[in-house]
C-alpha cells in the first residue's frame, strides 16, 4: 500500500523519493536519511 509521508513526497517510492531503511520516511536521497537513536528511527536531514 502507498501511504502519505509525514514529511513530503510518497512512500512508494516515486521519483525523488528514497524510503529510509527501517522507517517509512520519504527523502530526496539516501544521504538525506539520518539515524537517531537507532537504525529503526530515521528522519530526513
Swiss-Prot record:
Presence of keyword Disulfide bond: yes
Organism: Californiconus californicus
S-S pairs: 17-27, 20-33, 26-44
Subcellular location: Secreted
Keyword field: Disulfide bond, Knottin, Neurotoxin, Secreted, Toxin
One cellular component (GO) term of this entry: extracellular region
Lineage: Eukaryota, Metazoa, Spiralia, Lophotrochozoa, Mollusca
A molecular function (GO) term: toxin activity
Tissue: Expressed by the venom duct.
Prodomain positions: 1-2
Domains: entry comment: The presence of a 'disulfide through disulfide knot' structurally defines this protein as a knottin.
Protein name (record): Conotoxin Cl6.14
Amino acid at each position: 500500500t502507498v501511504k502519505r509521508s509525514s514529511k513530503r513526497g510518497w512512500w512508494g517510492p516515486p521519483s525523488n523519493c528514497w524510503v529510509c531503511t527501517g522507517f517509512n520516511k520519504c527523502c530526496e536521497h539516501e544521504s538525506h536519511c539520518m539515524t537517531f537513536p537507532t537504525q529503526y528511527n530515521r528522519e530526513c536531514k
